[in-house]
Swiss-Prot record:
This is Receptor-recognizing protein gp38. Its main location: virion. A motif (GRM 7) lies at residues 192-199. Keywords: Host-virus interaction, Receptor, Viral attachment to host cell, Viral tail protein, Virion, Virus entry into host cell. A motif (GRM 3) lies at residues 151-161. It comes from Salmonella phage S16.
Amino acid sequence: MAVQGPWVGSSYVAETGQNWASLAANELRVTERPFWISSFIGRSKEEIWEWTGENHSFNKDWLIGELRNRGGTPVVINIRAHQVSYTPGAPLFEFPGDLPNAYITLNIYADIYGRGGTGGVAYLGGNPGGDCIHNWIGNRLRINNQGWICGGGGGGGGFRVGHTEAGGGGGRPLGAGGVSSLNLNGDNATLGAPGRGYQLGNDYAGNGGDVGNPGSASSAEMGGGAAGRAVVGTSPQWINVGNIAGSWL
């Protein structure tokens, strides 16, 4: 809860745990010296979230709602387990431009992914992989990447020869293989590897792409899906760039 008036002194102690105004000012990121304690009103101490469990179906809308609920409070998210978007059609994380938080820090100690694209089938090319981060708050997003930030791999292209059709492999991570009416399906991708396209003699559907890479075309020249992007939108403040698969800014 932010510092409130009219009893600013007791309010800042409750918010920061600091009895001395100078120490409370540091906790509340008040940099002016000298300062009036009235400048504490509306400010909050940094909130720290620890994410220690893997989530392979993460929904960005949940995170947006939680951040909005904090108002102007800055939030630090320590990501200590792998996170994957629930669909290649949505990024793993999205930070809309109207988020009220003073700043948001991502300390990434694991791998975070856009989801891999679905493999194509018959005359259809592979589907694109999902993006990882959509940032529309500029440098209010701070990224300390000690793990991997990955766009999802594209799905492999399908093929059809005569009445025979087969599915391409899913893009890494967790992209679904293309499903054929003849049950000649592409393999689903795992967290660690893209799926293989169905092989039928000299004909084949395309393999799914690894993270940050497009899927492969089939022998019938149905193209693979485009790679998902790692970071899209406006440039964040990079504390540490680290390992990235896919385009970023």
